[in-house]
Amino acid sequence: MGNTAIAKKGSEVESVKEFLAKAKEDFLRKWENPPPSNAGLEDFERKKTLGTGSFGRVMLVKHKATEQYYAMKILDKQKVVKLKQIEHTLNEKRILQAVEFPFLVRLEYSFKDNSNLYMVMEYVPGGEMFSHLRRIGRFSEPHARFYAAQIVLTFEYLHSLDLIYRDLKPENLLIDHQGYIQVTDFGFAKRVKGRTWTLCGTPEYLAPEIILSKGYNKAVDWWALGVLIYEMAAGYPPFFADQPIQIYEKIVSGKVRFPSHFSSDLKDLLRNLLQVDLTKRFGNLKNGVSDIKTHKWFATTDWIAIYQRKVEAPFIPKFRGSGDTSNFDDYEEEEIRVSITEKCGKEFCEF
């Protein structure tokens, strides 16, 4: 590296520091003073279910006044309470309304009624990375690297705000109209300064320290990044089995096998991310994220250009118009029922 290149690297590191410092001020201001509810169910025309979960669903809706399309997440308060997800749900809304980053889905409105909580987010018509990955089989390394770079930058941003994401998987990554990623579902995200102990996440993506009920930190996100990059480039995750317990045994064993088509740089990066020993895992060492950003597999990545969305995406999803749902599966439609009496008012008073 010549002196000018070193100087450029130095100034880039400085400008990232400045950027993150300002981002933290912005975040803390919104985190401490979340704005009041700014809409109601009657403001939206419901179009179609985009996905369902254990305590709610996500629907495509159209804002009647502006005719804009949005994705509305509807959570049944009583089910949230039954499944002991109150804290997670309050976290999700409080975090989403306070963050701002090119690869994070934006929360536009939130409100509640007697029965449900509502989070209205920008609609990302390209659908889940999951469905594209399954259809194509696997992504080429440059294709996988394009997405991985966006996750690296997103985690660098979130971690600088003391946020752990904890739910990285292809189902939670939407592909937007420009072919870039939008991270969605902050249901497990949490603001943590030191360690935390909650068992949550998706079996294939859990870090060993979560499985072993150890206190864990943001390094679990870097482990999950390793799982994601492997799955994007292979077409299947590094640890899989029929039963979660068998998956956990494989994860904790620290043994990973790579497909023969993986480049040696990719294998090297993955060995450092899928590292059971926390004192050796990339992202968790004294250089932090720069061990990942300067790794050989990312040598061709222009981090600033990715952040500015100036790099041409390897794939643009096909869709017709802003309200097209052809990239999402079909689900059985169900009426939204709202009780005449308030449910769980106390539990969700801060929502």
Curated annotation (Swiss-Prot):
Residues 299-351 form the AGC-kinase C-terminal domain. Its EC number is 2.7.11.11. Residues 44-298 form the Protein kinase domain. Activated by cAMP. It is a lipid-anchor. The keyword rRNA processing does not apply. It catalyses: L-seryl-[protein] + ATP = O-phospho-L-seryl-[protein] + ADP + H(+); L-threonyl-[protein] + ATP = O-phospho-L-threonyl-[protein] + ADP + H(+). It is found in: Cytoplasm; Cell membrane; Membrane; Nucleus. ATP binds at L50, G51, T52, G53, S54, F55, G56, R57, V58, K73. The keyword Kinase applies. CDD domains: STKc_PKA. PROSITE patterns: AGC_KINASE_CTER, PROTEIN_KINASE_ATP, PROTEIN_KINASE_DOM, PROTEIN_KINASE_ST. A number of inactive tetrameric holoenzymes are produced by the combination of homo- or heterodimers of the different regulatory subunits associated with two catalytic subunits. cAMP causes the dissociation of the inactive holoenzyme into a dimer of regulatory subunits bound to four cAMP and two free monomeric catalytic subunits. Interacts with PRKAR1A and PRKAR2B. The cAMP-dependent protein kinase catalytic subunit binds PJA2. Interacts with GPKOW. This is cAMP-dependent protein kinase catalytic subunit beta. It comes from Rattus norvegicus. The lineage of its organism: Eukaryota, Metazoa, Chordata, Craniata, Vertebrata.
